């Protein structure tokens, strides 16, 4: 990567981080391109060299937000309970060390439930499902006796809901202590 390409990529990351903060604080409709440009100290025109529209920028953030959880639910050689322990540990570690990750959980919740996000985002999110693949892993763990009995889908929702709740809380106050990952895994 050339120096110029490296600088452009760093600037793009600054834009993504600043826009994430603004979208989390003000919502999609409440955030303007002017707000984002001001937060990164550039003109609106220059911002359009990186992202053609607010919708494109928001879509880029939501796409990033989908990549983490979806990569977590890919087939794994780990025993099911080890998968859930490792996943919780990894996510909580990221949440503690990178405020971007905690805020991304908040953005994704907003994107799912808000009526004012672009239709393209809603379409993209319609295929987003971490619950079903993890429910299947839970069922395997139940069969081998490492995961408690109960509705696998409900247990999956409890697991991801706990992680999301921790992320949301720490995004608002990073000074609070982060729960231990095994507490999350113990839900299962």
Model-derived features: positions:
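N-terminal intrinsically disordered/low-complexity leader segments
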Residues: 1-10
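C-terminal peripheral helix-coil segments that are non-catalytic and often amphipathic
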Residues: 2, 82-94, 131-144, 161-188
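Helix-turn-helix
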Residues: 10, 14, 18, 22-56, ...
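Short coil/turn segments at alpha/beta junctions that flank glycine-rich nucleotide-binding fingerprints
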Residues: 25-29, 98, 144
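Hydrophobic alpha-helical connector segments
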Residues: 60, 73-101, 155-159, 181
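Short, basic, alpha-helical segments at the C-terminal edge of helix-turn-helix-like DNA-binding modules
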Residues: 63-69
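Amphipathic alpha-helical packing segments from all-alpha helical-bundle domains
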Residues: 70, 74-75, 82, 117-144, ...
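Amphipathic alpha-helical segments used for helix-helix packing
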Residues: 96-121, 171-172
């Amino acid at each position: 990567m050339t120096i110029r390409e490296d600088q452009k990529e760093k600037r793009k990351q600054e834009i993504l981080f600043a826009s994430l903060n603004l979208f989390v604080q003000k919502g999609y409709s409440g955030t303007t391109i002017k707000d984002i440009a001001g937060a990164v100290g550039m003109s609106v025109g220059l911002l359009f060299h990186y992202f053609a529209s607010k919708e494109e920028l928001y879509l880029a953030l939501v796409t990033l937000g989908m990549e983490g959880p979806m990569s977590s639910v890919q087939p794994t050689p780990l025993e099911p309970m080890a998968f859930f322990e490792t996943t919780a540990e990894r996510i909580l570690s990221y949440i503690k060390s990178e405020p971007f990750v905690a805020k991304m959980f908040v953005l994704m919740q907003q994107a799912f439930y808000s009526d004012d996000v672009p239709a393209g985002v809603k379409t993209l999110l319609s295929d987003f499902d971490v619950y079903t693949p993890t429910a299947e892993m839970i069922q395997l763990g139940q069969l081998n006796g490492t995961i408690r009995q109960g509705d696998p889908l409900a247990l999956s929702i409890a697991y991801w809901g706990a992680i999301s709740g921790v992320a949301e809380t720490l995004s608002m106050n990073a000074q609070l202590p982060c729960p231990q990952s095994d507490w999350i895994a113990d839900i299962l």
